[in-house]
Amino acid sequence: MAITRRHPPLLLLFLAVAAAATATIAGASQSTRPRPAVSPAAAADFVRRSCRATRYPQVCERSLMPQAPAVGRSPRLLAQAALTVGADRARSCSGYLGGGGSSSSSKRSGGGGRGGAVGDCADTLRDAEERLRQSAAEMSRMGRSGSPRFAWRLSNVQTWASAALTDASTCLDSLATYAAPGVDVDALRKRVVAVSQATSNALALVNNLDPHHHL
């Protein structure tokens, strides 16, 4: 006597497929769901409170408050914005130093230009800008907080931002005893200090993303 194979009812098969499709759609909607709207006052307060954890809180507030609407209350977006601010300042400063940061009369006399300590400093700050932009880009690829990928990428950002801060410090050291006719050395140093402070603040905000940093 032949044995008849029993096939699952068509209805059950349909329900299984429908359930799988529903789960897939739900997961996709959660991953693409926009962040809840944050009021301007709440976003500004978040920036203000977050900046208290930095070494230069007033500098932090002034530079990041314009980013508050885009940041909302996201520590990750705030750190990313701070890295971009640091990179922009490094680019501006390296361009200024690359021109010698001197008056036209001193350039004609050979006091300006990219030679010596100023030129080395400009090159160093270009390295700092590259590291900070690389760090900001890495922040976009970090993934879910607490995951191995997050920890790995966060470690990269911490390493690169720390190196950028070292670059700024090296530049300041090279200008400590620098002097040239017609060159406003104080103006040079102030610009480099601005880079150093912005980078220090960015690194502090990045470190706040590390759960081990609070232990």
Question: What residues fall within each predicted segment?
Answer:
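Cleavable N-terminal signal peptides of Sec/SRP-targeted secreted and luminal proteins
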Residues: 7-24
